[in-house]
């Protein structure tokens, strides 16, 4: 269900949004690899506690994209991007967070459902992994994913058609 709070975009936060955000933050803040994080659910940069050590990467994420569709059983997922730290000092800064996409070290998403998939790239192709529940591990199921030269389908969100420019 809904919480009584809104995210930085003014969208009503779902309780599952907040749970996912806290889970990702708690899983990632103590690795020693990150200098900062930024989430759609927070207005400011999420600092890494000093007692965990700080690294040279920044994690940007939307903990539960599509959460407004939870009650109608449409797929939801987590979107993430990783940048290398560019500023001096130990703490991550706004300059570390607001880098262009071409500077990404890695990016990907996880889509949750009856089959949970992780898709990511580090700039050397896009690879898909499917969660094997019996092992509790993601197994490479879709190596070197690419767009077909001649696509069979085209999809657009007609719910936002009023925002399209004439063309």
Language-model regions, residue ranges each:
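Conserved phosphate-binding loops in N-terminal lobes of ATP-dependent enzymes
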Residues: 1-15
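IMPase-like, lithium-sensitive Mg2+-dependent phosphomonoesterase catalytic core
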Residues: 5, 18-167
């Amino acid at each position: 269900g809904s919480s009584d709070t809104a995210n930085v975009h003014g969208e009503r936060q779902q309780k599952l949004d907040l749970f996912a955000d806290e889970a990702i933050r708690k899983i990632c803040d103590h690795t020693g690899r990150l200098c900062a994080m930024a989430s759609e659910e927070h207005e400011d940069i999420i600092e890494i506690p000093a007692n965990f050590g700080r690294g040279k990467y920044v994690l940007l994420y939307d903990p539960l994209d599509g959460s407004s569709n939870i009650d109608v059983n449409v797929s939801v997922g987590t979107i993430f991007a990783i940048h290398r730290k560019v500023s001096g000092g130990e703490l991550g800064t706004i300059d570390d967070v607001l880098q262009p996409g071409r500077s990404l070290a890695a990016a990907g998403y996880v889509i949750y459902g009856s089959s949970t998939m992780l898709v990511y790239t580090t700039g050397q192709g896009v690879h898909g992994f499917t969660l094997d529940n019996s092992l509790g591990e993601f197994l490479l199921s879709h190596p070197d994913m690419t767009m077909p030269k001649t696509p069979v389908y085209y999809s657009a969100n007609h719910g936002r058609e009023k925002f399209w420019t004439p063309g």
